[in-house]
């Protein structure tokens, strides 16, 4: 894959993720957009690691750590959302102010 194509793909994914985080009112959609942002960061890490320093795999190793963090977020996030849904009967972000109660 050409260097510029990978950066453009990463920029598109990151932009879609940021737009989704800003405009979403649903917690599940916000979690999906956060995953898009993390995947865009991984593409950047692997691309720059391959292009600038192909002998040392620092970017690839760091992207594995980001994938592990994303997996933990993917496991814990829906559990938190389902807990909030059980208590509030809604997954809308503006209705889930837990500090009010």
Curated annotation (Swiss-Prot):
The chain crosses the membrane at residues 2-22, 32-52, 61-81. GO terms for biological process: ATP synthesis coupled electron transport; photosynthesis, light reaction. Its main location: plastid. Its EC number is 7.1.1.-. It is found in: Plastid, Chloroplast thylakoid membrane. It is a multi-pass membrane protein. GO terms for molecular function: oxidoreductase activity, acting on NAD(P)H, quinone or similar compound as acceptor; quinone binding. It holds the Pfam family Oxidored_q2. This is NAD(P)H-quinone oxidoreductase subunit 4L, chloroplastic. It comes from Glycine max. The gene is ndhE.
């Amino acid at each position: 894959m050409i260097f510029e194509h990978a950066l453009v793909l990463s920029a598109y994914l990151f932009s879609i993720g940021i737009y989704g985080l800003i405009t979403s009112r649903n917690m599940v959609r916000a979690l999906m957009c956060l995953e898009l942002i993390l995947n865009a960061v991984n593409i950047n890490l692997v691309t720059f690691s391959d292009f600038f320093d192909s002998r040392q795999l620092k970017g690839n190793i760091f992207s594995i750590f980001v994938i592990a963090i994303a997996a933990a977020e993917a496991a814990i996030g829906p559990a938190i959302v389902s807990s909030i849904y059980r208590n509030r009967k809604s997954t809308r972000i503006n209705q889930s102010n837990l500090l009010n109660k």
